[in-house]
Amino acid sequence: MHPPQRLTRPLVKASLRSTFKLASRTPLPLGVLRASMELGAGLFVARRDVRLSTVKLGAAAALCVVPKRSNKRVLLHLHGGAFFAGSSNTHRAMASELAARCHATLYMLDYRRAPEHAYPAALDDALNAYHALLGQGWMPEQIFLAGDSGGCAHVLSLATALRDQGSPLPAGLILLSPFVDLTLSLPSVTHNAKRDPMLSANILKRGADAYRGKLALNDPRISPLFAPLHDLPPLLIQVGSEEILLDDAVQLAERIQAKGGAVDCQVYQGMWHNFQMFNRLITEAEDALEQIAGFVLKNSHT
């Protein structure tokens, strides 16, 4: 049972403002911010009804999450963290929720991060991981690609790369609070700057600059909002109405639909970045996770 929403929602927002958003505005080194995110991961506990192990998937390590009830489907999740932070540790609880609800094996990939590794290191790791799943015997129609925040840029880049290579495409894409325009030039970045309780443009710009290497921020290889978006698998996009990244999600959905793609863009009123992580406190997060499970079930071909 969830606590009263009139109490928990403002408390969570206040907590995020005084911790995550405050830190995101500082000039602290990226390594310090990365470490603080790892420490904060202790507040989110994985479900007990899943089995966790660390494995090698392609060239990178990954957290493998297997629920008690697992059908023949698999999720490859690329975590967020503005390209320089986040890991299978920070996203362990989310991984357990997605695996259990989708009745799917889930791999949370520890791809190489900026600033130590700029583009295309993360994409290369994701490509290798996807082909490793195929090598294990998974069929493309059994595979879903998922991501949150900056991880969504990697997911879209992976999907478009597979399409352009003529490789088999996965059954669907799941994008949570996508950060896919590294120029940070869309209106919501300004309009929601005060309303967003979690993110600042400052930290996203620092992460984007660390990741892009010598590429321009609007290069479609790193800002997939500007990439050719035709012939993609079905997509589910979820975003909070108070995010500075709201327009990333909305414009991405519009551009894919304009190319004839199937996309369901769900805007959750009053919600913030990656609100799905707070499912034990917020009913909207619980609903969002169930929507993800429904999308996976609908698009499964097993």
Give residue ranges: language-model regions.
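Alpha/beta-hydrolase superfamily serine-hydrolase fold, recognizing
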Residues: 15, 53-63, 69-302
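A glycine/proline-hinged amphipathic helix-loop "lid/cap" segment
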Residues: 1-69, 301-302
